Amino acid sequence: MRQISFFLLLLLGLSACSSQYNIDGNSSLACLDGKKLYLRVPKTKGKAANGVNIDSCVVVHGRFSFGGTIDSIALAEIYVGDQHLMPVVLEGGQLLLQVDNYAQTITGGPLNDRLSEFMTQRARFDNELWELDRTANRLLYNGKTMAQVMSLLEPRRHDLLQKIELLENTFILDNVNNVLGEGYFLMLTEQQPFPVMTKQFLTIIEQAPASFRRHPLIHRYLLAAGYVPAAAEKPQTAKTSDSVSQKK
């Protein structure tokens, strides 16, 4: 009887440490129908920094779903093959996803609400950049030279890129104490062809608390990029994207 009680308590304890999540998604993108989606979380152990697929599903008539348990809140990513589709916070409970041509939205839980608001703002800037590209192509088609198009549109493009960077920096620094800040910073690092400290990364790292830099994956990236904290004797040993381009 005591042995049964022990295993019952152990089972209850394990249940308390994990949470159940259910994701229901809708997509208006015809290109996703019939495609297999993968739910991927970061791999914090081992030398490889690749993500781990914890679930998969097929999009049928614009609908898809994931479900399972997770030990702790995590920022996961949904992939179509090797192509990133969107992030989602696995924070337990029922999560609803909407994917269309203009944005991706997530509802269900405070962190997902915060993430969805950020993604909506980011999508507005991305759409403006896309419109600039269309305008550039139209001007070139109508006989404008590349130099004329650049002179006309580059100031607006630069302004949009600055706004995107500020939005991303603010989002990360406002969420340094939860999975959103850590996870989105790591998503930005994945966009680099190799570990390097860009000006944006330096800005974030220098303003973030030490606990942020101690995150296993962030710490691993900083070491690979040659980052040295500002308080160290030789901070100039950190590699930056500008210095790499100058060497080339």
State where each predicted segment sits.
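A short, acidic, amphipathic alpha-helical segment used as a generic capping/interface helix at domain edges
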Residues: L166-I172
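A non-transmembrane, solvent-exposed segment enriched in polar/low-complexity residues
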Residues: C17-D159, E165
